From Swiss-Prot:
This is UPF0194 membrane protein YbhG. The lineage of its organism: Bacteria, Pseudomonadati, Pseudomonadota, Gammaproteobacteria, Enterobacterales. Residues 107-208 form a coiled coil. The keyword Coiled coil applies. Its main location: periplasm.
Length: 331
């Protein structure tokens, strides 16, 4: 009798375990997938593109910032001076280019022609004097030194005539294409320097790139700053994203566009609504910040969830429970 009783008890225990497991599995299926994540921390380090002395800051930590808002300014004076110099450089280059295009005036050509005539007369005189000196040298009336001096004077007069003739030829034919191109390039370079000076002056004003809340004010007016030095740190408040991770077994449930519910400790009975906006195409080891114990040794995929009804109570870094049950489709 004892043996049938033992067998019966064993069968009853097995049935109980199976029933309990079935109930647990069904309850897990009814509850849906649950993940744990955090509100994404999204910040921007705001800096001047140019360096200089910080003249003013118009905001403080905790202030609400609007895109396009003036946050602070550098000392403008050095950049205003540079802009004036750049404008003067453009004026000089423009004048030089215009001269190259216009060529030489009639008065300049006439002066060059007169210089040629004068140089020609000087050369003719030097040549005739040299010829006479040669005759005297043959009769040994003058010394070799006197003849050499006459030759040098003739050669110098010839060089002066050649230079005057070349100058007159240039005046009559106008400037070379290469010279005009060089003047044009100098003008374009001066204009580029002017544009850069205007941009540098514009960049002495610090403009908010987007809406947000000011987290930190790293420096104070009077500080000397290098280009790119962080002045302010802005927390981007919209849109609000939640970062969560899912293992490969449940990856099929996390399709982009799927609606889900997001719970926080501060309002457990009033969930936020969200949609999956991005699923990472590559797996990674579970980050240390993930709170789910059974995922800590798994390869997981990162999710970005866009909160569609976020408010100021949903702060960056806040832990969030992500529910994938069917309620999210009807809430």
């Amino acid at each position: 009798m004892k043996k049938p009783v033992v067998i019966g008890l064993a069968i009853a225990a097995i049935v109980t375990v199976i029933a309990g497991g079935t109930w647990w599995y069904q309850s897990r299926q009814d509850d849906g997938l649950t993940l744990y994540g955090n509100v994404d921390i999204r910040t921007v380090n705001i800096s001047f593109r140019v360096g200089g002395r910080l003249a003013s800051l118009n905001v403080d930590e905790g202030d609400t910032i609007k895109a396009g808002q003036v946050l602070g300014e550098l000392d403008h004076a050095p950049y205003e001076n540079a802009l004036m110099q750049a404008k003067a450089g453009v004026s000089v280059a423009q004048a030089q280019y215009d001269l190259m295009l216009a060529g030489y005036r009639d008065e300049e050509i006439a002066q060059a022609a007169a210089a040629v005539r004068q140089a020609q007369a000087a050369y003719d005189y030097a040549q005739n004097f040299y010829n006479r000196q040669q005759g005297l040298w043959k009769s040994r009336t003058i010394s070799a030194n006197d003849l050499e001096n006459a030759r040098s004077s003739r050669d110098q007069a010839q060089a002066t005539l050649k230079s005057a003739q070349d100058k007159l030829s240039q005046y009559r034919t106008g400037n070379r294409e290469q010279d005009i191109a060089q003047a044009k390039a100098s003008l374009e370079q001066a204009k580029a320097q002017l544009a850069q000076a205007q941009l540098d002056l514009q960049d002495t004003t610090l403009i908010a790139p987007s809406n947000g809340t000011l987290l930190t004010r790293a420096v104070e007016p009077g500080s000397m700053l290098n280009a790119g030095s962080t002045v302010l740190t802005l927390s981007l408040t919209r849109p609000v994203w939640v970062r969560a991770y899912v293992d490969e077994r449940n990856l099929s449930q996390t399709q982009p566009g799927r609606e889900i519910l997001l719970y926080t400790d501060g309002r457990p009975d009033k969930p936020y609504h969200g949609k999956i906006g991005f699923v990472s195409p590559t797996a990674e080891f579970t980050p240390k910040t993930v709170e789910t114990p059974d995922l800590r040794t798994d390869l997981v995929y990162r999710l970005r969830i866009i909160v569609t009804d976020a408010d100021d109570a949903l702060r960056q870094g806040m832990p969030v429970t992500v529910k994938f049950n069917d309620e999210a489709r009807h809430e």
